Amino acid sequence: MPLTPDARELLSLLAYVYLENNRPEKSAVLLNALRTLDLADNRQLATLALAQLRAGKSEAAMATLDLLAMQGGVDASFHLIRSQALLALERRDEAAAAMRAYVALRPAPAAAPTEAETT
């Protein structure tokens, strides 16, 4: 029986709740199940890599990030998670390069309204 879209969303939401409540291992299990079923989108793969990283599994996080990159999911958050994983693996030069890529790709902050615009 295939997983319904609602069930998929529920697993993703539960994984997020686990991650936010300092249970990265449980989050990784749920997200890895979605990946195994070929139901994980790029956001869920990035969250899986973050959960693996927070669970102390930096090598697994790098493997997940490699998969994400092959699927075209390279964005600012990808580089941020990658820099953290590389730093955990003590690959400082690569971590610095990934952080520079994150800074280059992150969205520009919204400009604060000027006094003339607020009056």
Protein language model regions, located:
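TPR/TPR-like (Sel1-like) alpha-helical repeat modules
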Residues: M70-V74, S83-P109
